[in-house]
Amino acid sequence: MKRAYTSTILQRTLSLLAYTAPAMKLTRITCLLSLVAFCSAAVFAQSSFTVGTATAAAGQKATGTLEIPAAADAATSIPVVVIRGSKPGPVLALVSGAHGTEYASIIALEKVIQTLDPAQVSGTVIILPLVNIASFEQKVPHVNPVDGKSMNRFYPGKQDGTQTERVSYVITKQVVERCDYLVDYHGGDIDENLRPYSYWPKSGDAKHDAITRDMVLAFGLDHVIVWSDRPKDPAASRYLDNTANTRGKPAIAVEAGYSGTVQTDDVALLANGTLSLMRYLKMLPGAPTMVEHPVWLGKVDTVASDQPGIFYPVVQRGTYVEAGMKI
């Protein structure tokens, strides 16, 4: 009823403005823009946003779960937080814990949840701080121990598939398809020693790529891996960020952390990067802190040993190397 009433007011005002003298053109436009903004804010204030069991009205923060029913294997329950700002704006999805032992990224989103004040937010933030529950509980790196699959390799998922596929399906439907922007967080697994970096997924669409490029620069990690060979088929998107990008929702992936540890600096990079990105998206007041001199990495090489054993590095992570160097 309230939306219909607002619409009627807008229609009547437009009719009235149409008959106003030409000399009042600028005033008419100003009034119309003000009325549209007022109506948009009024509708936003009256509406709530629900993901899973979490429902937040304007100016509220709500917690709940995404319930994944049992099928060929066990059910699972994923925590979700919805932060509904006090003012209209885009919907931003933040997802971490696809690999449950990448702790820095999980803790970073917990920090973001605690930091964000709905009164200061324009728009809505959906946060999934821990997706791979079994991996976290059993301390299993890389995969979901329930079905042995990585939770960042089976998007957009299957409604009747294994647990990993069902989780991916629900996230696609409940989160990806309802957001405007997305960030996928990683934190250096138990057997990884990584320097902080972002992924810039180039789609070939100039307008879309300009947005995702600005997103990685606004996030603030100065090393950026450029991915231009991601699957183009939305039905076989494979990665979470790619699932959003193939559906027209600008998305990036970020990583900070190493060896399954929680270091204050890594957590701060991810948490502060999130706030800077939200400023770029006009979801928080203030200006973003953009990377001024990014290092663009266009190629990733893997150096494999031809013998089994234990690897003892002689260089620190982030060290520049060249052919022939002992690493």
Regions found by a protein language model. Give the residues of each.
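Generic detector of N-terminal low-structure segments
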Residues: 11-12, 40
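Bacterial N-terminal signal peptides that target proteins for export
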Residues: 14-17, 21-31
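Bacterial N-terminal signal peptides
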Residues: 31-42
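Structured catalytic-domain cores with a bias toward divalent-metal coordination
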Residues: 45-327
